[in-house]
């Protein structure tokens, strides 16, 4: 079919995708932290939201909206501020609610699956670095002169999502196993809360320093 790249391109793209999928980022930090604090279902909901954000970014690249955002200094700056601010909010949540699974807080507040999905969506959708990434990553595998380029770009974006699932899902299961051990140690639990808060804050700072190129 005309919208499917050749086999060599697909193999190269698959290898690159797997390598990128295991690279830590704000989205991975989110669904691992949500799994630790709220359980496996919440972790998968966050992961699903992040993948939906990836699909939206793919669509924006295909229709050219991402290029317009990067070309507009004001739009790019606003997106950076909102994206960084959202990660700071998640850092605060990690401290305020992160230890909700500890023995002393069994009746603590639970985050709904929809809110976890929305959090995952927000982490990817408000991250300008993802816009820059998809604008530079996907086009490497499609010729600019190919009349079927839009269809191939979208196909590769969907392929990126499909290949990411079996790579990232085991991390949720691993986090669930780790949370069982953490329940016996409130002190370790709190250390992990601060760890995730620090990681979210670091990613927020990284987003603020992103430059449109």
Place the predicted regions along the sequence by residue.
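Selective transmembrane alpha-helices of multi-pass membrane proteins
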Residues: 71-100, 167-171, 179-213
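Alpha-helical transmembrane segments and their lipid-water interface positions
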Residues: 49, 53-65, 87-90, 131, ...
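Flexible cytoplasmic inter-helical loops of multi-pass small-molecule transporters
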Residues: 96-113
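Residue-level hotspots within the lipid-embedded alpha helices of multi-pass solute transporters
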Residues: 18-21, 124-125, 161-169
């Amino acid at each position: 079919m005309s919208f499917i790249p050749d086999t060599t391109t697909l193999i190269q793209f698959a290898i690159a995708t797997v390598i990128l999928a295991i690279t830590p980022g704000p989205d991975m930090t989110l669904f691992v932290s949500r799994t630790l604090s709220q359980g496996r279902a919440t972790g998968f909901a966050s992961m699903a939201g992040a993948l939906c954000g990836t699909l939206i970014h793919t669509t924006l690249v295909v229709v050219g909206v991402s290029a317009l955002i990067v070309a507009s200094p004001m739009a790019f700056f606003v997106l950076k501020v909102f994206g960084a601010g959202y990660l700071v909010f998640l850092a605060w949540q990690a401290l305020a609610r992160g230890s909700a699974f500890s023995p002393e807080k069994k009746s603590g507040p639970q985050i709904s699956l929809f809110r976890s999905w929305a959090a995952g969506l927000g982490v990817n959708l408000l991250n300008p670095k993802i816009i820059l990434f998809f604008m530079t990553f996907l086009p490497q595998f499609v010729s600019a002169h190919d009349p079927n380029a839009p269809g191939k770009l979208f196909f590769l974006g969907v392929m990126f999502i499909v290949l990411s699932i079996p790579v990232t899902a085991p991390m949720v299961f691993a986090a669930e196993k780790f949370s069982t051990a953490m329940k016996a140690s409130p002190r370790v639990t709190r250390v992990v809360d601060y760890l995730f808060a620090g990681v979210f804050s670091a990613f927020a700072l990284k987003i603020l320093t992103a430059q449109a190129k």
